[in-house]
Design a protein with these regions (language model features):
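Short beta-strand-to-turn element immediately C-terminal to the catalytic PLP-Schiff-base lysine
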Residues: 101-103, 143, 169-172
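Internal helix-loop-helix
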Residues: 48-119, 160-166
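Short secondary-structure junction/hinge motifs that connect adjacent elements
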Residues: 27-49
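A short, Trp-centered hydrophobic/proline-enriched beta-strand micro-motif
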Residues: 118-126
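Residue-level signal for inorganic ion chemistry
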Residues: 10, 21, 74, 104, ...
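A short core secondary-structure module
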Residues: 152-184
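Cytochrome P450 C-terminal beta-domain/meander region
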Residues: 134-152
Length: 184
């Protein structure tokens, strides 16, 4: 496997990210862990630095940055500085791509600009009280009704859920098929 080392531009980015995590994240980490919530201000500050959803297209306010090494730098610096709940990675690399890759144009226009700026906090709801993270054992159901869907079920351990503005919810749409899941 050929290693693609970080170039000088990436090292400048790392220096900037390191300063951000030292000044804006590390001092609050213990308080956030005790309270089980990351301050909304952290998302706004990360957005102001351009650290949220860097992959997103420029038309939504992103940088259109496809090189994962920049994200890798953020992940490394976040871990090195106390890992205050994965707020950047969960928001930008787990939840937002569902919108970016599968959302309608209207959903992208509505939600991505705020996710990029940090004004809109994203969460994902998959884990259930009786099924845990076993998605095949999920009990939540979604049934199509006229021009919308009706969701029924329970979720727990919703990462970023306590302060989320938008929550992606997984539910079974084809209960007979263990893979018959849809994200809403």
């Amino acid at each position: 496997m050929q290693r693609r080392p970080f170039d000088s531009e990436m090292e400048l980015f790392r220096d900037s990210a390191r300063k951000f995590f030292q000044q804006e994240i590390r001092p609050h980490g213990e308080r956030w862990r005790e309270a089980n919530i990351v301050d909304r201000e952290a998302f706004l500050k990360a957005g102001a630095q351009g650290y949220l959803c860097m992959w997103a297209d420029e038309q939504y306010g992103g940088m259109g940055l496809k090189d994962f090494r920049y994200e890798q730098i953020l992940i490394e610096e976040n871990a090195f500085h106390g890992d205050s709940g994965y707020f950047i990675s969960l928001h930008s690399r787990l939840v937002a791509p569902y919108l970016g890759n599968f959302g309608t144009d209207e959903q992208k226009q509505r939600f991505l600009p705020g996710a990029i700026s940090g004004e809109t906090i994203l969460a994902v709801a998959m884990t259930e009280p009786d099924a845990g993270s076993d998605l095949a054992g999920m009990k939540s159901r979604a049934v199509e009704h006229d021009d919308h869907w009706v969701l029924n079920g329970s979720k727990t351990y919703i990462s970023n859920g306590i302060n989320a503005d938008v929550v992606i919810v997984a539910a079974k749409t084809h209960p007979e098929n263990p893979h018959g899941l849809t994200l809403f």
